[in-house]
Curated annotation (Swiss-Prot):
Reaction(s) the record says it catalyses: L-aspartate 4-semialdehyde + pyruvate = (2S,4S)-4-hydroxy-2,3,4,5-tetrahydrodipicolinate + H2O + H(+)
E.C. code: 4.3.3.7
Organism ancestry: Bacteria, Pseudomonadati, Pseudomonadota, Gammaproteobacteria, Enterobacterales
Protein name: 4-hydroxy-tetrahydrodipicolinate synthase
Keyword tags: Amino-acid biosynthesis, Cytoplasm, Diaminopimelate biosynthesis, Lyase, Lysine biosynthesis, Schiff base
Transmembrane segments: none
NCBIfam families: dapA
Protein task: Catalyzes the condensation of (S)-aspartate-beta-semialdehyde [(S)-ASA] and pyruvate to 4-hydroxy-tetrahydrodipicolinate (HTPA).
Species of the source: Sodalis glossinidius (strain morsitans)
Length: 292
């Protein structure tokens, strides 16, 4: 459940900005049918930063309800306050989620020791499997391999979503951790190379609109069929790149609407709708990928 193509699911909203349960079910059904390995609910792509705490919990619980055991659900529970991250995590202790994805604290930029103590505190207060999430471009904080290795010694810290795009991190972390510690890419454009170097999958933005293709890509790579995997990845590469043409999840929500996967591409401020120029670029990427 923690390997292969794991989607960082968008949070669909209606025209007034309320959570759209009908579209959420449609998205979940699409991922079940497409072979997505697991769903991350309310991560960065799910607009965690603009949801209230109540909405955050509601979306995770609705995702569990609507998936109805057909696909594992991972809850996004990161925060830049340790007490808040602990509270979010404990909220889902007996919910049915299979684990939590917890991003490094953002804006306050803790030291490596601060990062260690932050994640240790979360793990000590929940039995749920914890996946660390390192994305310095968004957080301003880079969790280095020696810190990851220290955290990997804690029983329920089972892996990391590594989204630096720096492929050398794979071997650097592998040298310091046990073989059962999961390395997951957080960068679609380099995910295939990441897997070839020893990663076990990707937590993917692209999978929101190319779920079947991303599941196939990961399966081919896991089987060692890199020639076919590369051909598929080459077709998807414009999509990997252009879904970040404007700040994510702006382009991917527009793409989900364009493919009929949800009713609107509504976002909440400070996220704004995709520009006309952006829509042309993303539409072309969808066409190049054979999705339109």
């Amino acid at each position: 459940m923690f390997t292969g193509s794991i989607v960082a699911l968008v949070t669909p909203m209606d025209e007034k900005g309320a959570i759209d349960r009908v579209s959420l079910k449609k998205l979940i059904d699409y991922h079940v049918a497409s072979g997505t390995a697991a769903i991350v609910a309310v991560g960065t792509t799910g607009e965690t930063s603009t949801l209230s705490h109540e909405e955050h919990g509601d979306v995770v619980m609705w995702t569990l309800e609507l998936s109805d055991g057909r696909v594992p659900v991972i809850a996004g529970t990161g925060a830049n306050s340790t007490s808040e991250a602990v509270s979010l995590t404990r909220r889902f202790n007996d919910s049915g989620v299979v684990g939590c994805l917890s991003v490094t604290p953002y804006y306050n930029r803790p030291s490596q020791e601060g990062l260690f103590q932050h994640f240790r505190a979360i793990a000590e207060r929940s039995d749920l499997p914890q996946i660390l999430y390192n994305v310095p471009a968004r957080t301003g904080c880079d969790m280095l391999p020696p810190t990851v290795a220290r955290l990997a010694e804690i029983k329920n810290i089972i892996g990391i979503k590594e989204a630096t795009g720096n492929l050398s991190r794979v071997s650097q972390i592998q040298e310091l951790v046990n073989d059962d510690f999961l390395l997951l890419s957080g960068d679609d454009a380099s995910a295939l190379d990441f897997i070839q170097l020893g990663g076990k999958g990707v937590i993917s933005v692209t999978a929101n609109v190319a779920a079947k293709e991303m599941a196939q890509l990961c399966a081919l790579a896991a089987d060692g069929n890199y020639a076919d995997a590369r051909r598929l990845n080459q077709r998807l590469m414009p999509l990997h790149q252009k879904l970040f043409f404007e700040p994510s999840p702006i382009p991917v929500k527009w793409a989900c609407k364009a493919l009929g996967l949800m009713a609107t591409d509504t976002l909440r401020l400070p996220m704004t709708p995709l520009t006309r120029a952006g829509s042309r670029v993303v539409r072309q990427a969808l066409t190049d990928a054979g999705l339109l």
